[in-house]
């Protein structure tokens, strides 16, 4: 509905309260173009209404007949109403003091980081830094993360984050399989590794033929394993000296992975110093709330020899066109978008925002501050150990950092009962033992309460904390010889921003370098960079969501589970499937889970031999990478000249592999930005040969309310809540990748048996460390759907399609639109073909992308799915004014190219070849170019009042990969 001017409302007969309330509709905030703008764009396209456009774009055979069946959420709520409804759910959660440990710990998020990173759209609305020149701020923050991890682990190089500790362990396993002992398929897991980690490892190992063995760490060298996973400290708190064991494993031809607690490594000898080949772990306790399991940034660090086999993203240092230091994503040829099924991993989205928070926690506290925190945590654990021993209890582990396992015998139930009365959670190790993991937030009063719990169970009086402290001088809880002596975090960045003033300014200086949605549209095709509304983001930092341990008792998480159930029902309605799991914490993991579900279904029918996965040539790189991880053989299906699946080739491949056909993976609308007319036929062909249909949900933003994969033949899909359902991209994560399935596949959805979470009868194993994955950001999608309601969600989809077609129509005279459906229409994105321009002018798609930075825009998706093209997706959130600004920039760039084609500009010395132009270059004393400074920096008038300056010139990618350097840069290099 178009907002009316208040004066007009005042001059009419008074409106009803209901009519006035519609003027606070959230949809009017979320959808960019108002009614007048939409009609103007429709007029440009030659349609009388949005409905007429949609009828022409989407095949009638797959149109949804009914309104989205959202039940109680069909009618939109105002922002205030939705927040109140979610607050009521949050209040059903009980925030206990959780000393469960098991990889998750309460922590203090420094307020300066909470407000200026987690709650700051300059950080959370940015995209993955594939365009380095406009991403230098978050690249520096991620480089800090890598330096922090490398220093603390004592290893050569770290990646820029993975999804969670369990996933990182599984990635380490497959890394060592690729590089290690050729005659072994055994991966050995010590029996004191986190149970959720072991379960994810088992899930990942099964389809690729790895045998997982478990047992005492001491037996690892005799296991004939290509790799061994050790926990340091162990889940029960033990800190063991693994130096001799590591030497023995190496002598036997194996490699060693260590799951290490980074805070503990400030006081313990790092694994890199005693022979570990790989270190993995979670950085959650560095200032990131527990959030019922996530999101958190995992890490993976390796010895130098493994750096080119690392999974995930890697930030490296290079130089720009002026020879100044610049940062970029390094060694991208390892990744799925390039190597497809041969990639080191299928991970696309990681946990950039959380990695940035963890790195800034280290920057803010510095090495001395971190060590002080660690020593205090260790001291509290030591006092607790002394106290429970005075009360007559024995500790299982004599060495520890922060975790005690306590023999409580027949009094175990009493201990838990008394703890519950004080709103305390302890780990239920067994019927005779409890675990206690203290943390940064544990106070003297908390310690007194813990001692009182054990005193009540023992029928005694708790010793006083001060008396314990006075009597425990000089007692060491760390093994002799394992105290850390090496320096860490010596780089200046970790030693200068310890006042809040300095930290605030440092964060501001970094965010000012970057281009995010808070500055301009980001028209990345297949990425759906839509509004992340502030009201959607607010609940993420509520303690009732952030302060919950993922393994807290069910009665403490009633509100969470109710919200999750409602969100699952919303997604079922949107997709047309029967059931959804929210456990996968990225689209890549939802995709992987979907393929495992298909395999489990075939196996349950005695057809476990079905292992062929058909994938169109145009598919996103995660598709073949995930299929390979799921143990499937990839067979490529050709696409025709229009970009559609070649039906004849599909029939031939399906017939050829009929006996072994497991699935086809298709994207809808297609990766070419078109609603293929024959999608039902594609599904029917595969079903006829016994296969299942996997519909990639990356483009769900073009389907919500209009069509549904579960209704036109899909059996399983993953969704990207960080695309369609408004979770922000965070500069490269977090994401959520739910897997949605038909009724016949529902019983195979992911479980997590190690923690008692089992929702599916024959469910596959866990694919994430926590039962509900990145649970604390699920309220974002819940809020979006609740505030939009059924009709407005459909209107958003229609507007996304309208915006894309408007751009395609306006730019078609200047750049050919490569693929379109009937009537020359596209779906929610369009592909602009720049290949003819390259032939006539020498200007590349990369040149255009860099030149767009001078105009204040992030480039569209480059060279996907077709090399030499730009894929543009504007989303429904961008206004016509912003679309016109982008169109004007693209037309102006085309005229600059035309000047090269006609000889009016030099083929080498022109504003495209030297883009982007920094302020330092434009204001330098010397100007060596034939074109003017004004043309370089202010090519259109609108930039005069709103200019973004790229902080570096064009990054030299080849130099960065040839001279790989992935640590913080000395200040002298910036001189």
Curated annotation (Swiss-Prot):
GO terms for molecular function: glycine binding; glycine dehydrogenase (decarboxylating) activity; pyridoxal phosphate binding. Its EC number is 1.4.4.2. This is Glycine dehydrogenase (decarboxylating). The glycine cleavage system is composed of four proteins: P, T, L and H. Its cofactor is pyridoxal 5'-phosphate. SUPFAM superfamilies: PLP-dependent transferases. Gene3D superfamilies: Aspartate Aminotransferase, domain 1, Type I PLP-dependent aspartate aminotransferase-like (Major domain). GO terms for cellular component: cytosol; glycine cleavage complex.
């Amino acid at each position: 509905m178009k907002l009316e001017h208040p004066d007009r409302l005042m001059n009419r007969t008074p409106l009803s309260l209901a009519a006035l309330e519609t003027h606070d509709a959230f949809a009017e905030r979320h959808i960019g173009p108002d009614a007048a703008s939409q009609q103007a764009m429709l007029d440009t396209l030659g349609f009388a209404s949005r409905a007429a456009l949609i009828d022409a774009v989407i095949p009638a055979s797959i149109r949804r007949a009914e309104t989205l069946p959202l039940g109680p959420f069909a009618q939109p709520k105002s922002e205030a109403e939705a927040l109140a409804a979610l607050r009521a759910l949050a209040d059903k959660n009980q925030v206990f003091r959780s000393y469960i440990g098991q990889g998750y710990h309460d922590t203090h998020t420094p307020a300066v980081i909470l407000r200026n990173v987690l709650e700051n759209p300059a950080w959370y609305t940015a995209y993955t830094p594939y365009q380095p020149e406009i991403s230098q701020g978050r690249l520096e923050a991620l480089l800090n993360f890598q330096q922090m991890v490398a220093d603390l682990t004592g290893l050569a190089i770290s990646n820029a984050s993975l999804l969670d500790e369990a996933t990182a362990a599984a990635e380490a396993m497959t890394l060592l399989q690729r590089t290690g002992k050729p005659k072994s398929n055994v991966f050995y897991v010590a029996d004191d590794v986190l149970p959720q980690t072991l379960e994810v490892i088992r899930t990942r190992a099964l389809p690729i033929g790895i045998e997982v063995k478990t047992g005492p760490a001491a037996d690892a060298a005799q296991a004939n394993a290509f790799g061994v996973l050790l926990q340091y400290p162990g889940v029960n708190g033990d800190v063991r000296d693994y130096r001799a064991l590591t030497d023995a494993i190496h002598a036997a031809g194996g490699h060693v992975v260590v799951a290490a607690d980074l805070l503990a490594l400030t006081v313990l000898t790092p694994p890199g110093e005693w022979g570990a080949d790989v270190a993995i772990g979670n950085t959650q306790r560095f200032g990131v709330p527990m959030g019922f399991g996530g999101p958190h940034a995992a890490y993976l660090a390796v010895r130098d020899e493994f750096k080119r086999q690392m999974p995930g993203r890697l930030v490296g240092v290079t130089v720009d066109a002026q020879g100044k230091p610049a940062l970029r994503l390094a060694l991208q040829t390892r990744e799925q978008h390039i190597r497809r099924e041969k990639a080191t991993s299928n991970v696309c989205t990681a946990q950039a925002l959380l990695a940035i928070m963890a790195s800034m926690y280290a920057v803010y506290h510095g090495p001395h501050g971190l060590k002080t925190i660690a020593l205090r945590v260790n001291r509290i654990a030591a006092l607790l150990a002394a106290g429970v021993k005075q009360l007559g209890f024995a500790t299982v582990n004599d060495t520890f950092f922060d975790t005690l396992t306590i023999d409580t015998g027949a009094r175990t139930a009493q201990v838990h009962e008394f703890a519950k009365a004080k709103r305390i959670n302890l780990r239920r190790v067994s019927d005779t033992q409890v675990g206690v993991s203290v943390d940064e937030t544990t106070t003297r009063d908390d310690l007194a309460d813990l001692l009182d719990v054990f005193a009540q169970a023992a029928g005694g009086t708790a010793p006083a904390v001060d008396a314990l402290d006075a009597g425990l001088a000089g007692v060491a809880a760390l093994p002799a010889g394992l105290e850390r002596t090496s320096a860490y975090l010596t780089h200046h960045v970790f030693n200068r921003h310890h006042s809040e003033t300095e930290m605030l300014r440092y964060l501001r200086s970094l965010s000012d370098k970057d281009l995010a949605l808070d500055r301009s549209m980001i028209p990345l095709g297949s990425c759906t960079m839509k509004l992340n509304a502030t009201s959607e983001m607010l609940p993420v930092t509520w303690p009732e969501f952030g302060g919950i341990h993922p393994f807290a008792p069910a009665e403490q998480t009633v509100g969470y589970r109710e919200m999750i159930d409602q969100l699952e029902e919303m997604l079922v309605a949107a997709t047309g499937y029967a059931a959804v799991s929210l456990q996968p914490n990225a689209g890549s993991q939802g995709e992987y889970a979907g393929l495992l579900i298909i395999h489990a279904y075939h196996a349950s029918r005695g057809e476990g031999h079905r292992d062929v996965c058909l994938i169109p040539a145009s598919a996103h790189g995660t598709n073949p990478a995930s299929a390979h991880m799921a143990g499937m053989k990839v067979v490529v299906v050709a696409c025709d000249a229009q970009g559609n699946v070649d039906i004849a080739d599909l029939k031939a491949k399906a017939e050829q592999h009929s006996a072994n056909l497991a699935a086809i993976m298709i994207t809808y609308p297609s990766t070419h930005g078109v609603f293929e007319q024959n999608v039902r036929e594609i599904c029917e062909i595969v079903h006829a040969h016994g296969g299942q249909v996997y519909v990639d949900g990356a483009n769900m933003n073009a389907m919500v309310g209009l069509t549904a994969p579960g209704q036109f033949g899909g059996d399983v899909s993953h969704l990207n809540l960080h695309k369609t359902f408004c979770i922000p991209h965070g500069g490269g994560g977090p994401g959520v990748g739910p897997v949605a399935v038909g009724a016949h596949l529902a019983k195979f959805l992911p479980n997590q048996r190690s923690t008692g979470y089992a929702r599916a009868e024959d469910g596959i194993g866990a694919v994430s460390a926590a039962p509900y994955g990145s649970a604390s950001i699920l309220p974002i999608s819940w809020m979006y759907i609740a505030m939009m309601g059924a009709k407005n969600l459909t209107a958003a989809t229609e507007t996304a399609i309208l915006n894309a077609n408007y751009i395609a129509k306006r730019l078609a005279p200047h750049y050919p639109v490569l693929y379109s459906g009937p009537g020359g229409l596209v779906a929610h994105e369009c592909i602009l073909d720049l290949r003819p321009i390259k032939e006539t002018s020498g200007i590349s798609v990369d040149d255009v992308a860099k030149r767009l930075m001078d105009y204040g825009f992030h480039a569209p998706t480059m060279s996907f799915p077709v090399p030499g093209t730009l894929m543009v997706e504007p989303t429904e959130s961008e206004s016509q004014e912003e679309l016109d600004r982008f169109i004007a920039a693209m037309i102006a760039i085309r005229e600059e190219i035309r000047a090269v084609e006609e000889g009016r500009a030099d083929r080498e010395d022109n504003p495209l070849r030297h883009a982007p132009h920094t302020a330092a270059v434009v204001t330098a004393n010397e100007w060596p170019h034939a074109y003017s400074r004004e043309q370089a920096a202010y090519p259109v008038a609108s930039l005069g009042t709103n200019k973004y300056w790229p902080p570096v010139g064009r990054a030299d990618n080849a130099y960065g990969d040839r001279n790989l350097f992935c640590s913080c840069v000395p200040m002298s290099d910036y001189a």
